[in-house]
Amino acid sequence: PYTTLFRSAYNLCSRVQGREASEAVGDAAMVMTAGELLQLHHRGNASLDEPTYFEIVRRKTAALIAVSCALGVAASGAGQPLQDALRRYGRKIGVAFQIQDDVLDLTGEERVVGKSVRRDLSKGKLTLPIIHRLSTAAPLDRGALLRLIEQAAAEGPSGDAAADQLMADVRDAGSIDYARSVGERLLEEALPELEALPAGPARDMLNYSTRAVIERRF
């Protein structure tokens, strides 16, 4: 998907006068490639911690949304300060968006989400709720959780037994709520960046859309 997105982005950027847009997309592509490699390196790593998780997300989803926000205002002729503000905004909501994706992958219903759920577990990818649960578990509980994670990965998306048991534990331990609270905090940090925009319908729509990032169910 990223390859198709960036191919289309480069095609559009080639029609814009000046090279700033192409350079911005190119820089984002390099950052996202590094993020993908970092994620592959840590796939199946039960010791993955929150700082590394956030570094991966910042280099992937957040980098894509940040450059999109910055280029959007750049296309309107906005100066560098406004571009920087929207880039910071995009980076924050990009991380929040990914956190909500993590939550939906564990708690969502396929018919509502619109795609397969529990794909991360089947691929051996640890997401924020799982990472938080592992970090707060007692040693014996952590061992049991790791076995459930291995079973869920072995069962794949079609298997439910281990994934259901793991999901119940993660939810009851408060790790789903924890992940949502992190997303909420990021949105609260992102919203002030929109004050750099002139008051009007565009800013109002962005304020409204920001809430949808973590309230969405698909």
Language-model features, listed with the residues they occupy:
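All-alpha prenyltransferase/terpene-synthase fold signal
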Residues: P1-F218
